[in-house]
Amino acid sequence: MAPPLPDGNDPRPFPPLPESGDIDAGTYFVPVAGHTEPFEITVPDGWFALDGGSLGKDDPDHPAEWAVYITLLPVNYVATDACTWRGALADDGPSAEAFVDAMAAQSSTASTLPVKVTVGNYSGFEFDHFVEANVDMNACDGGKLCIYSRHTQACSRWYSTRGERETYRVVDLNGKRAVVAVGRIDEAINPELMREARAVFDSIVF
């Protein structure tokens, strides 16, 4: 089914990204919490959405769901320790730099050095985030690594496998940050699928 046309009074040329279900190929807009303008994302066939905050695509040759994914969730709290995260979700402040610093300081995970990037007219940072080699995920709270959350008492974004890895892009939107990421469930994912996911990630325009 084709995506709905924008409302006649809406100046945006694209429809909103569906909150759940299969996504038709096309360009969509996504609201940013605390910012007046949405961003745009272009998605090919075969992707699906979940809860308005994530996009995913399966690898037919891999047993796991969500082989590759894009996350668009707002971040209010970062776990100081991703393994023992219950009671350790800390408010990292509203800036892009604060998020980068909190992720780099997080125990049980590791980050690459952040690289400065420009997305449209906005500046930001990009870095990779992944599980530390010596972490026993079965011993972690809930059997998972909590990366960040929208709330203090529950986890919004977590890793469930040791091979999970993400590339984050955090953009400063005139004092309000936007956080987006592209990831894979483990290293066995088809490289072509990962390249497709990266192209979706790179299509994001603020």
Name each region found by the language model.
Residues 1-76, 82-83, 152-163, 169-176, ...:
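N-terminal targeting sequences that direct proteins away from the cytosol to non-cytosolic compartments
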Residues 21, 26, 92, 98, ...:
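Generic signature of intrinsically disordered, low-complexity, basic-rich segments
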Residues 63-96, 107-110, 134, 139, ...:
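Post-signal peptide N-terminal regions of Sec-secreted extracellular proteins
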Residues 94, 98, 102, 192, ...:
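Extracytoplasmic/secreted proteins, especially bacterial periplasmic and envelope-associated proteins
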Residues 97-169:
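Signature of long, low-cysteine stretches enriched in small and polar/charged residues
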